[in-house]
Amino acid sequence: MKLIFNETKSSQPDPFIFEDNGTFYLYVTANAGVEAYESKTLTGEWIYKGAVTAFEDAHDFCAPSVIKLEDKYYMYVSCVANNNFQYMHVACADSPLGPFKNEKCLYDQFSIDSHMVKTNDGLFLWYAKNNLEHDLVGTRIYVDRFIDPYTPENNPKEVLLPEFDEEKFTPQCTEEGDWYTLEGPFWFKEGDWQYLMYSAGCYQDDTYHIGYAIAKTDEQDLKKVDFKKVKNGNKFSPVIIKNSFEEGTGHHSVIKVDNEYYAVYHARDYQNTNSDEYVERRTARICRLSVNDGVITAERFENHI
């Protein structure tokens, strides 16, 4: 189901949902600064609040996430700044609607798709970066411990690797061969299980999808957890992929409300076009998730959840 917005001309790529004091916030990718929406209910009208970042000389803000720590709000987001392409930054605000400022660059390389989480063992940042030293080169999912919200340990662990043709990013990104993409990690724990959801493939392709990995453990040091990708035998096993009413389904976040899990993700309506030029049509959607004993299934409907 599409989310309902009071401002209908915009797209909402890479949506991250966040709840604070009974209000829901949605943060999305945008060129001039991370854009935000606000709503009192998941399926009611979302009000456009504009750009909430206050970075200097930066653009192409991608895939933000937000965490609240001791009455401060921290946003982790990649952007283009100082001729550095999509390096991960952190910024702080006193309100969920910003302005997020006092930014700091966290890594000196391409690093995208954050999800900062806190366990009893500390802060851990899930994100994606490139690995060129493998048979299947491309973007992988990593986790790094943080000393404080601004300071990574800078010793990330590679967690998920590509395995399937459906995880290729096309058109090819290298002259040498195929490029594989795992990105958009989102971690949560339910019962005895830890879940690591992710996006795979190219957002313009039919095979772009959301999958997940699992670990049955109470381990709080997330760098010590060994996640196993959920597969259908030797084939990929998407939780969310294109269906009869939407395509381009990917990059998501998860929220638990009234003991029910929901995924908020972007997708596109089907559209007949003869042009090869990409037009941004990704909009935020929502579906209910069933999460039970290491298994996630999605319940998707076109006009309700």
Indicate where each model-derived feature is located:
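Carbohydrate-active catalytic/glycan-binding domains of CAZyme proteins
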Residues: M1-I305
